[in-house]
C-alpha cells in the first residue's frame, strides 16, 4: 500500500475498534446505536470527518453514492446528537499515536498553541455564542472559539479546546491542553501574547514542560517586577506565586517583593 492508503486504513481501523466498545463514545450507552440503521456509529464517524463544504443533503448523497434511499438530514442530526465529544478526541489521539512525531534536534517536540474563531449557525437564543448586531453584522452572529495544539515538525494537530465565543478563556484552555498532553518526549509549548500569565507559566512548570510565550516588553517588566529588561537573552528571575493577598500567610516574608498574586478565577 502507498503511504496515503496506510494512513486511511489506520484511521478506519481505529473507528472499527471504537465501534466494538461504544459505551465510551456515546451519550447513552444503553440506547444509542443499538439498532441497525444506515447511519450507524461507524458511518457517522466516517461521514463527519470526510464532509466537505457542500450542503448537508449534498454531502449525504455523495457519501451514499446517490442512492435513492439516502438518509434524511433530520436522521443525520438525530444520530449525531448521540455522539460524545470524547469520540473525536479519542480518534485524534489514537491516530496520532500510530505515527510517531518528528523531533527537533532529536529531542524536542515544538508544539504551537493558538486560538481561532469560527462562525456557526445563527441562533439568537444562545447567549453564550451569539453576538448582537453591530457595524459589521446587521443581524448578529454566533461564534465559537477554538484553541489548538499543532506540532510544527510533523505538521500535525494534536489536541483542541472548543469554547463558546462569549465565554472564551485562553488561559484555561492552554492549561487543559497541557494536562491532556500524552505524547511524551520533551515538549516545548509555543504561544503568542494572549497566553502570557503567571498561572499558565506555573501550570507548565508543574507539568514539567518547557514553554516559550511571547509578551510585550511592558507586560514582561510588570510580570517580573523590573523597570528595564537585561540585554542578554537568558536571565534567571525568581518569583513566588500565591492565591492569597494576605501578607500574614506568606511563608517567606523576607522575599515579599518576589510575591505575585494569582486571581482565583484564573
Label every PLM stretch briefly.
Residues 1-56, 62-63, 67, 71, ...:
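Single, function-defining residue in the core of a domain
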Residues 93-102:
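A short, well-structured juxtamembrane/interface segment
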Residues 109-111:
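Conserved beta-strand elements of the Class I
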Residues 128-133:
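Short Pro/Gly-enriched beta-strand edge/turn motifs at strand-loop
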